[in-house]
Amino acid sequence: MSATFPGLVHDAEIRHDGSNSYRLMQLGCLESVANSSVAYSSSSPLTYPATGTEFASPYFPTNHQYTPLHHQSFHYEFQHSHPAVNPDAYSLNSLHHSQQYYQQLHHGEPADFINLHNARALKSSCLDEQRRELGCLDAYRRHDLSIMSHGSQYGMHPEQRLLPGAGLGLPPPGADDLQGSVDAQCGLVLNGQGGVIRRGGTCVVNPTDLFCSVPGRLSLLSSTSKYKVTIAEVKRRLSPPECLNASLLGGILRRAKSKNGGRCLREKLDRLGLNLPAGRRKAANVTLLTSLVEGEALHLARDFGYTCETEFPTKAVGEHLARQHTEPKEQNARKKMVLATKQICKEFQDLLSQDRSPLGSSRPTPILDLDIQRHLTHFSLITHGFGTPAICAALSTFQTILSEMLNYLEKHSANKSTGTPDTNQINSNSDKTLRKTEAPTKDGKIEKTE
């Protein structure tokens, strides 16, 4: 047994006192054996002896904290002190030694395969500890990892335990669904050595997921509302044309100033795949709209449009402008000018209505050409979504004013052709001719006299 696995020492030589050094020695040896790319024959059945006092359980205790740094340093020293674990196992000089080592494993005793089985289980335990440190343990259970490492105990065919995939960090048949769920929820993949790495250094996230909720800046205390900020919106604030720094982004998200506030924000963004370097300078000028999240900016634009539609004196303004040009020679030219202005304004409104700039959690498909859409998107990003709806509301109000001007000109020209005076002119003449005086009486009543 010692010839096959020189790194495993008998119990009589090493005292099993539960110390970390002994556990790490088992870890370094068993992991190196399990990671060796060896093909096993299906002709040698795997049997388990009734009693195995020669081999201690390779599992760590439940309260054991796995430290990869100590393991790496100890494993390096362990490789140079034991000839069976060759650090130059993939070089050409050790080819003959690797073939001899393969023959020893291939014709080994059935008990030798127990070590390989324990090594796989030990690697699963180490993988469990690493994923717990990354905070992604909720995405799967240890029972699922046991399915990947414990062959026939969970329904796998007995001969499949001899395949090299389960001991080399490769998922067995039927484990694709488990691996896909772990990748989707944690953004983690298994490398060739059974370790855990991040896919591209970031977690896989959905841009429409909620990043935080921000209280409104413009709302009164009696009607305070919160607006949801998505990951896509935070990415837009960090991207051109604004390229906000940590201080401005923290102000938008209404984060309290603290000593490590910028570092905590950068770490949270880094976990989501967003890069916010320290010492970054903003690229655009800061305005009052910069402090608004997109939800509040859209709310402000909607209230502005409603106020313009209901409260702006469009009829009075339109008639006042049309009354400045009541000469018969000017009326026809004035009508043509108003109609041309209405047509141009309508074309401008139609263009803005086709704007498909990304806002909130929506990213609609562009309708306009990219040459004009990118400019509209730039304006929308600078104003946080307030600009285009506000301009549309102003254009709608302007269209109403032009319509009132046109109605007044048509009515005035019709009255001129029939010879009937205008109603406004009648009212003005009546105000001049009729002068009413009010005199109080003894009874306290008001008496009207002409």
From Swiss-Prot:
Broad class of where this protein is predominantly found: nucleus
Domain of life: Eukaryota
Compositionally biased tracts (Basic and acidic residues): 432-450
Keyword 4Fe-4S found: no
UniProt keyword list: Activator, DNA-binding, Nucleus, Transcription, Transcription regulation
Tagged with keyword Nucleotide-binding: no
InterPro entries per the UniProt record, alphabetical: TF_AP2, TF_AP2_C
Polar residues biased stretches: 415-431
Places the protein is found: Nucleus
Gene Ontology BP annotations: positive regulation of transcription by RNA polymerase II; regulation of cell population proliferation
Cellular component terms (Gene Ontology): nucleus
Region (Disordered): 414-450
Chain spans, region H-S-H (helix-span-helix), dimerization: 280-410
An example Gene Ontology molecular-function term: DNA-binding transcription activator activity, RNA polymerase II-specific
Subunit-level organization: Binds DNA as a dimer. Can form homodimers or heterodimers with other AP-2 family members.
Role description: Sequence-specific DNA-binding protein that interacts with inducible viral and cellular enhancer elements to regulate transcription of selected genes. AP-2 factors bind to the consensus sequence 5'-GCCNNNGGC-3' and activate genes involved in a large spectrum of important biological functions.
Assigned protein family: Belongs to the AP-2 family.
Protein name in UniProt: Transcription factor AP-2-delta
Organism: Danio rerio (Zebrafish)
